[in-house]
Amino acid sequence: GICISDEVQVGGGRVGKSFWGFQAHNVIPDIITIGKPLGNGHPIGAVICKKEIAESFANGMEFFNTFGGNPVSCSIALQVIKTVKRKKLQKNAKLVGNYFKNELIKLAFRAHLINL
């Protein structure tokens, strides 16, 4: 089988504990898809895969993307990654995430609408 990790929602330090969501599960995916966190609102995406999978595209099948390799988008993605690291946004995501989780747990005990 093939393991695919879709990092569109959880990638780029958003889970706090690790930079990529799959790292929290101690797996190494065959394919990783990255989108929204990479461009912080600017349209960009990426697919990262193991060498064997990439080589399977060398059989003559062509892939075309209108905006593929756009230098502006690539520059923005690089700056987003640098900003996340420089401003320690992954650490902040962990702090805010823990706070939010704890507040939801408190709410669950006060309001009988949430079942834990």
Describe the function of each predicted region.
Residues G1-L116:
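Conserved N-terminal phosphate-binding loop of PLP-dependent enzymes in the Aspartate aminotransferase
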